[in-house]
């Protein structure tokens, strides 16, 4: 199947550049308000500032995402516009690389596949905050492009950079290996796979060297116990929070169309790489299984979304895929609920960021008015305080993310009043196995 008709008159690079610019521009109205609702995004900003000011590497959270943290340390003075803007930049790279893969698969609407992917709510939201999801995926998609061109060393280096942004990208070594098997002649397959593995290991090790030199290999096994949501919550997080109601409808249309096509046994364009479709299915299965194991954040499924969009572009009949893409393009801007149509997730996220910052400033005004030198456990607000008001973090009061026994004991010996936010008591118990109230800490509501 030929590319989009317009590309017959205009070089392909022009359409890729236009696609990149369009996706990047669509993010700009939403990147200037703080670093996002997820506190890990604030941790990235905090670590970037520390690295820039001290020259010493500090992870935002174990096991770290050193490529993102170090690059952000070069631009952190630009605030949300710079750090969120970098996420937007990498989201445009990821979508453009996805378009290149779709085009190589013979998809007539490869450009629409990229736009649909970029509009998936979880992707759009991830591209306007400080999280690492789209940084990693950009390098993953570029590594796929390299593998399809039978360039195992380039694919491995790019995958190593993806791992340096998000360690879970290491799982892509299997799908990339399958793609290389289909791209290389039989005699070159063993050597190609070996070069892929060695290049990935070398690049990944180099990317993670700041973490290993500072914290040792123990940092790679760290896991913060956030608890497991109910299955109902996990399903909602993995469906509606990923695609939105309209986007989920679109994906169901695409799946239905693909099943109908299989039943009719309609012919598909012959792929240059016969193993590309199985490799994408493997990619989707790996990241879906990883999410099922730890269903904490919808963003974990972003690589799954990329694979599924490509499979839909390949297998769905043209009307079904156009309907799917249309639903996805609208999904971040319009929501559907029992109350009817409403503002989409991207507008709700923007408003919630403004509200969260206002709430934090009101809280700090109250907390700083308390008498004495207090220790206050604030959970996710701790990195936000460190970024927005670093002079207050250890000033009149000390603000902590959580407290363990070693941290709590000297506070109690010094006679310091210890307070906790209402929802933090249970969180601290789950993470540190320590009930703050049992040791004399008090609910901050009692101070009002």
Locate each region found by the language model.
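Membrane-lumen/periplasm interface segments of specific transmembrane helices
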Residues: 192-257, 288, 292, 331-335
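Transmembrane-helix motifs of polytopic, lipid-linked glycan transferases
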Residues: 21, 81, 85-107, 142, ...
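Signature aromatic-anchored transmembrane alpha helix within multi-pass, membrane-resident enzymes
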Residues: 5, 12-21, 157, 197-205, ...
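Short acidic/glycine- and proline-prone juxtamembrane loop motifs at membrane-interface regions
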Residues: 128-133, 297-298
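Hydrophobic/aromatic-rich transmembrane helices and adjacent perimembrane loops
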Residues: 162-165, 171-174, 293-319
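Transmembrane signal-anchor helices characteristic of membrane glycosylation enzymes that use polyprenol
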Residues: 11-41, 201-215, 288-289, 330-335
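Loop-to-helix entry region of an early transmembrane alpha helix in multi-pass inner-membrane enzymes
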Residues: 62-66, 70, 77-96, 126-129
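Membrane-embedded, lumen/periplasm-facing catalytic core of multi-pass transferases
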Residues: 52, 327-392, 396-400, 404
């Amino acid at each position: 199947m030929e590319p989009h008709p317009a590309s017959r008159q205009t070089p392909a690079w022009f359409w890729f550049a236009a696609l990149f610019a369009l996706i990047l521009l669509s993010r700009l109205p939403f990147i200037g308000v703080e670093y996002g609702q997820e506190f890990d995004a604030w941790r990235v900003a905090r670590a970037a500032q520390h690295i820039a000011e001290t020259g010493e590497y500090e992870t935002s959270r174990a096991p770290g995402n050193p490529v993102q943290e170090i690059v952000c340390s070069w631009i952190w003075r630009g605030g949300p516009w710079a750090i969120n803007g970098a996420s937007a930049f990498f989201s445009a790279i990821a979508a453009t690389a996805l378009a290149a893969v779709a085009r190589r698969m013979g998809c007539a609407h490869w450009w629409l596949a990229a736009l649909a992917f970029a509009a998936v709510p979880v992707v759009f939201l991830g591209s306007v905050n400080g999280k690492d999801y789209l940084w990693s995926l950009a390098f993953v998609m570029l590594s796929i492009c390299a593998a399809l061109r039978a360039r195992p060393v380039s694919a491995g280096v790019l995958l190593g950079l993806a791992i340096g942004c998000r360690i879970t990208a290491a799982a892509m070594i299997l799908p990339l290996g399958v793609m290389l098997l289909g791209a290389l002649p039989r005699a070159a397959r063993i050597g190609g796979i070996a070069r892929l593995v060695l290049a990935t290991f070398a690049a990944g090790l180099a990317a993670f060297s700041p973490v290993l030199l500072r914290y040792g290999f123990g940092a790679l096994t760290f896991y913060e116990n956030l608890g497991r949501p109910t299955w109902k919550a996990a399903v909602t997080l993995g469906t509606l929070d990923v695609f939105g109601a309209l986007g989920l409808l679109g994906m169901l249309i695409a799946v239905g169309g693909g099943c109908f096509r299989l039943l009719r046994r309609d012919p598909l364009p012959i792929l240059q790489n016969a193993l590309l479709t199985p490799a994408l299915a493997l990619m989707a299965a790996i990241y879906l299984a990883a999410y099922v194991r730890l269903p904490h954040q919808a963003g974990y499924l972003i690589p799954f979304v990329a694979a599924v969009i490509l499979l839909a572009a390949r297998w769905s009949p043209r009307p079904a895929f156009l309907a799917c893409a249309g639903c996805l393009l609208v999904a971040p801007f319009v929501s559907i609920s029992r109350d009817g149509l409403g503002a989409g997730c991207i507008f709700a996220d923007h408003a919630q960021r403004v509200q969260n910052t206002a709430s934090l400033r009101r809280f700090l005004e109250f907390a700083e008015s308390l008498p004495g030198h207090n220790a206050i456990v604030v959970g996710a607000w701790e990195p936000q305080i460190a970024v927005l008001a670093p002079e207050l973090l250890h000033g009149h009061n000390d603000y902590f993310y959580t407290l363990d026994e070693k941290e709590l004991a000297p506070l109690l010996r010094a006679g310091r009043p210890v307070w906790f936010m209402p929802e933090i008591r249970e969180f601290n118990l789950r993470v540190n196995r320590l009930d703050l109230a049992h040791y004399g800490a008090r609910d901050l509501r009692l101070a009002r």
